[in-house]
């Protein structure tokens, strides 16, 4: 019976490349010369830390990071920016990375599938949702339906079986 899995995975090596490209752009931009501006990725905690001298520079670096995410085809919904806080003479902004389906989001997705009226079976299996049906076309309808919805994090469809 055809099935597929709905997951929300983040490729950390792509995120790392986006952060490195942002670091290179910071080094070459004229408006950041002579200023203490840095961005670093903590893969263990899955967060990005921006440190600048002003709140405005913090916003600029965040926008640069978003642009590099777009260029690397990483969904920016995976970013969860926290409020920039002042620590000493620097502003620090922590951006948490959303990776994996939490149980609340999985329940919302499962409920949306059931309320859509598409006759499929969906079940939550840990950090993924398995959707099964007799026809591939019905599964593709579910995929199209979910792409239209906004759940606050990027969704991928994998493990498609016939």
Swiss-Prot record:
Keywords assigned: Nucleotide-binding
SUPFAM superfamilies attached to this UniProt entry: YajQ-like
InterPro entries assigned to the protein according to its UniProt record, in alphabetical order: DUF520, UPF0234-like_C, UPF0234_N, YajQ-like_sf
GO cellular component: cytosol
Pfam families for the chain: DUF520
Gene Ontology molecular function: any one: nucleotide binding
General function of this protein: Nucleotide-binding protein.
Sequence similarity: Belongs to the YajQ family.
Name of this protein: Nucleotide-binding protein ABAYE0515
């Amino acid at each position: 019976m055809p099935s597929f899995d709905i997951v929300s995975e983040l490729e950390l090596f792509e995120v790392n490349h986006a952060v490195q490209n942002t670091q290179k752009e910071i080094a070459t931009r004229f408006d950041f010369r002579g200023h203490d501006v840095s961005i670093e990725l903590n893969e263990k905690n899955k967060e990005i830390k921006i440190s600048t001298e002003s709140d405005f520079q913090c916003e600029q670096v965040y926008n640069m990071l978003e642009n590099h995410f777009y260029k690397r085809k990483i969904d920016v919904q995976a970013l969860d920016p926290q409020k920039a806080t002042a620590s000493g003479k620097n502003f620090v902004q922590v951006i948490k990375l959303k990776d994996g389906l939490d149980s609340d989001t999985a329940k919302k997705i499962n409920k949306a599938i059931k309320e859509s009226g598409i006759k499929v079976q969906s079940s939550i299996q840990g950090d993924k949702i398995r959707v099964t049906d007799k026809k591939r076309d019905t599964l593709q309808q579910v995929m199209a339906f979910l792409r239209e919805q906004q759940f606050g994090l990027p969704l991928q469809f994998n493990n498609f079986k016939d």
